[in-house]
Design a protein with these regions (language model features):
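Cellulosome-associated attachment modules in secreted, modular CAZymes
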Residues: 2-218
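Conserved small/polar residues in nucleotide/adenosyl-binding loops
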Residues: 195, 223-224
Length: 224
């Protein structure tokens, strides 16, 4: 009887994270690094409740015996990304901004939309260009909920967060996207290193033509 009552008031929450685009063999690239916390919504709760690694399940974190109710899930991730964003990403976002190519999905859009305004335009090209040249060194990770096909990224607060209604055991699947990594080339075994420890990049110039945007992109990149 006690066990029954216990289950009526508590639940287990589980969240998994893998990197956008699996390996060539289709295997997920699980990520254990992101910090996930559930914050209660019925009270002021800035501390939150940490999700812990689920033994035997890479990329999965969970919390058992959670009080049922309304929560906000917040996801944070810090990881070195040196060299992951390069000229290929600049050209990729340039093609998207001009409508030459279309995004393959919400994750692709999150990678290309550098400033998070919902548009992919020359401002995003400039942002990715600055990052590829090392002018900017900030690595920003965004997360996407596979089930609802929605982004957790909130541009106003610069946080990854989503509402969770915990009325029973709940499991969600998230994808991690590195901002600016338009071709999803990030590989932790290669790029998870501090910029100063990495060799100095030799940035390739953008191919010039008569397009004003490209010429402007070149001139701005060298003056900043």
């Amino acid at each position: 009887e006690t066990f029954s009552v216990f289950n009526e008031t508590t639940a287990t929450f589980t969240a998994s994270i893998d990197k956008w685009l699996p390996d060539t063999d289709g295997a997920p690239k699980w990520m254990d690094g992101p910090v996930m916390k559930l914050h209660r919504k019925d009270i002021e709760d800035e501390v939150g409740i940490d999700l812990s690694l689920k033994d035997g399940h890479p990329g999965h974190k969970h919390k058992e015996d959670m009080d049922k109710g309304s929560y906000e899930l917040r996801v944070e991730h810090t990881q070195e990304t040196d060299g992951a964003i390069d000229i290929d990403d600049v050209m990729g976002v340039l093609s998207l901004s001009r409508g030459i190519k279309e995004t393959s999905g919400k994750e692709h859009e999150l990678a290309a939309d550098w400033n998070g305004d919902g548009l992919i335009d020359i401002d995003d090209v400039m942002g990715v260009l600055a990052r590829s040249r090392g002018i900017r060194k900030d690595a920003e990770w965004r997360f996407h909920d596979k089930d609802s096909n929605t982004s957790l990224w909130d541009n106003a607060s610069k946080m990854n967060k989503m509402d969770i209604e915990l009325d029973g055991d709940n499991e969600i699947e998230l994808t991690a996207i590195l901002r600016g990594d338009v071709n999803a080339s990030y590989d932790a075994t290669v790029h998870n290193r501090a910029p100063e420890a990495a060799p100095t990049p030799n940035p390739a110039p953008l191919p010039l033509n008569n397009d004003d945007e490209l010429i402007a992109t070149q001139s701005v990149s060298y003056t900043h």
